[in-house]
Amino acid sequence: MNRVVVGLSGGVDSSTAAASLHHQGYDVVGLTLWLMKGKGQCCSEGMVDAAFICEQLGIPHHIVDSRDVFEKNIIDYLVSGYEVGITPLPCSQCNRAVKFGPMLNYARQELGIDRIATGHYARIGYDEVSGRYQLLRAVDRNKDQSYFLYDLTQDLLAATLFPLGNQTKEETRRIAHEFGLKTADKPESQDLCLIEAHGSMQEFLDKYIKQKEGDIVDLKGKVLGKHKGIHHYTIGQRKGLGVAAPEPLYVVKLDPIMNRVIVGNRADAGQSECNVSRMNWVSIPDPSTPIQTEAQVRYRSFPVRVNVIPLGDNRITLVFDEPQFGITPGQAAVLYQGDILLGGGIIEK
């Protein structure tokens, strides 16, 4: 019998993934990662629901204490990024360093199981010519999460199942109801998991980063107002600047050395190119010559045409056909060719 470890968060997606595989005849083991430190986090609603689902399905349930791994790879990663004026993307980092990698290691070393599954909306293919596993967009483009999975390795893709990749969210809820799952009507999480535990991103950052007042200036250096810490701002931000001006102003740069927030008009917040580091080439080998494809520089943005220029050392330059608004250092630039995710990396300052 095929054995698989399913990551269970206690939500409808992971619950349905586990139930679907169990229904298909897989020998399923549920695994929940204990991520948050602090009072009450050991018995969070998600962990309780995950345990209930496993009991309902009649499958084993393991809880792995990942709090130190989460703090090092996500909390520290976020704080250090915001301190130097970038806006980190924790979800892709979490998927590789906290979830998929450690989950597969636990499955292999502790349970003797060589396959894992999650409730992510994405698909995995295999190219016979290149001999590489490919990461593909989900059928439900509105729920597609491949953008956050660009950092997965070939080993992880070879060992992973995405049972929900070929269905819509509505179908997932319908299937959950058919299985009688407690989580069938559970609302979706609207924020990062760590933000839900702290109230808001601002509250979270203020807990770790000391507020330091500085100037809000225009592109010529004229002081327009004051801020209480550059970690409260991100490139392209318009709301909450607290600066009066005859035309809308946007954050165009964060200067951690001078502790300044630099603002300008919308055109000033546009870029024709950017550098990307820590590239992980997923579905194709690392190219040695320029290629033309599409790039997505924010989760909810549309892919746009780019020229990709390899720089070596896992770095590339993206040259856009048209200037792009609000390209944000620390966020991911992910390359696609149709539904195929070619690779991705982190936008540099």
Swiss-Prot record:
Cellular compartments annotated: Cytoplasm
Catalytic residues in the record: C94, C193
GO BP, one annotated term: tRNA wobble position uridine thiolation
Record: residues binding ATP: G7, L8, S9, G10, G11, V12, D13, S14, L33, G119
Site residues by UniProt (Interaction with tRNA): H120, Q331
Organism superkingdom: Bacteria
Keywords associated with the record: ATP-binding, Cytoplasm, Disulfide bond, Nucleotide-binding, RNA-binding, Transferase, tRNA processing, tRNA-binding
GO MF annotation: an example: tRNA binding
Reactions catalysed, as given in the entry: S-sulfanyl-L-cysteinyl-[protein] + uridine(34) in tRNA + AH2 + ATP = 2-thiouridine(34) in tRNA + L-cysteinyl-[protein] + A + AMP + diphosphate + H(+)
GO cellular component, one term: cytoplasm
Location of region: Interaction with tRNA: 143-145, 298-299
E.C. no: 2.8.1.13
Transmembrane segments: none
Disulfide bonds: C94-C193
Function noted in UniProt: Catalyzes the 2-thiolation of uridine at the wobble position (U34) of tRNA, leading to the formation of s(2)U34.
Family classification: Belongs to the MnmA/TRMU family.
PANTHER family for this protein: MITOCHONDRIAL TRNA-SPECIFIC 2-THIOURIDYLASE 1, TRNA 5-METHYLAMINOMETHYL-2-THIOURIDYLATE -METHYLTRANSFERASE
Name of the protein: tRNA-specific 2-thiouridylase MnmA
Organism the protein comes from: Gloeothece citriformis (strain PCC 7424) (Cyanothece sp. (strain PCC 7424))
